[in-house]
Amino acid sequence: MKSSAIRRSRGFTVFETVIAIGVLAVLLTGFMVVFTPAAEGIRKSINVQQADRMASTLEQELVTLRSEPFTTGFNKAFTWIENKNKDKDALLVYQYRGSMTTLRNDKTPTPVPSVTGLLPGKDYVIVPMVRLRSDATNLKADLEAVEGGVYLVKCTQLVFNSSQLVAGTAGKIVDPISATMSTTPDDYPEAVIAFAAEFHLLPAKTSDYIAGTGFTAKFNTVKNPIFVRNLAVRR
């Protein structure tokens, strides 16, 4: 009888196993280096429609009179653009769930913190909003019903330089042509204030964070906005 030869398969040596583990570690490291920043960018990115909505919300709120002591929408816009580059009165843009039946004293929908058993469009609506950090009571209520992220907005007037509009000095409103300082809305000689609005996504959206020192530190050091829009307000 003819005997059949039994062929034994050879396993990996310890040396080969170590090499394979090393190659795998290099591949995983490369994957993390390439895709982790990309994932972070995707998380922070917003689409054009979202950017348009936030910019429009800011532009509209700047001239909307609520409970502030302003006589005109232009006066409000002048003051907010000039003074709101301080962390105490920082501008915040966000969306929250609002009631379709009840309003607060400032004519904004009452926040709806819990939506259990409720239907959007029937029991509540998503409200785009701009508030000052110093509007603590209303802001805290809004944040309990917030939808999506909260954005810090920094506004800087655009002025003429060599026939081009460029960013001026944050916290100051001047004649965009002569650079003469305007201390009040009545001093401002033009009918339009053009400004650049930087939108920065905040790392947290709780009222404790926004009222605390973490927000102040972020406000003073923030760079690289999610997006920037050139906007304008008119008398």
Name the predicted role of every residue range:
Residues M1-F12:
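N-terminal leader/signal peptides at the extreme start of proteins
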